[in-house]
């Protein structure tokens, strides 16, 4: 038993750790309805909490069903996670053009001034490939996410711009799993 525990602990030491700008890929064994076959972008991580958005679970509604009279009305909305499902969040590539944005990785930003986003949409200065909207978010308390990673619920990987913004979502999880763990590719 000690040998097995030591091997597991040793493997955990060499895994990528959770931090802002990394993605979490759910293991096939994670059968939670919300996180089943999920890819989550961590937008915030510290000793007290972790926050992220699920990149690959689109809802059946578009932006025009929430906000009236805006261009890009056919923009799909994604399920960000099970927390505060009535809240609207967004990631984008526009940086300081949207005041109060927080950089997640090079070229990807979280949030910012929503009135500016609406104005940029009306001015047709935002394209579909530059912004994504989410309802709700994914959240973990202190050490909860680290424990889930240690228990093999998540694979941690460095996020890339094209993963966050320019990817066809239905196959995102399976494509990543194929590159990370061949034994899970059939899932």
Report residues per predicted region.
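A short aromatic-anchored loop/beta-hairpin motif
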Residues: 15-134, 138-187
């Amino acid at each position: 038993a000690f040998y097995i525990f030591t091997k597991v602990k040793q493997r955990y030491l060499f895994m990528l750790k959770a931090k802002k700008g990394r993605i979490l890929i759910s293991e096939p064994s994670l059968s939670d309805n919300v996180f089943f076959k999920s890819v989550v972008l961590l937008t915030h991580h510290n000793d007290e909490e972790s926050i992220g958005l699920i990149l690959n679970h689109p809802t059946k509604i578009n932006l025009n069903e929430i906000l009236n009279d805006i261009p890009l009305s056919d923009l799909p909305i994604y399920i960000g996670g099970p927390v505060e499902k009535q809240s609207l969040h967004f990631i984008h590539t526009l940086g300081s053009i949207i005041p109060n944005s927080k950089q997640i990785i090079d070229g990807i930003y979280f949030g910012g001034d929503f009135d500016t986003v609406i104005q940029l949409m009306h001015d047709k200065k935002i394209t579909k490939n530059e912004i994504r909207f989410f309802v709700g978010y994914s959240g973990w308390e202190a050490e909860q996410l680290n424990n889930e990673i240690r228990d093999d619920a998540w694979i941690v990987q460095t996020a890339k711009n094209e993963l966050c913004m320019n990817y066809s979502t239905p196959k995102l999880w399976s494509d990543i799993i194929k590159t990370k763990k061949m034994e899970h590719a059939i899932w």
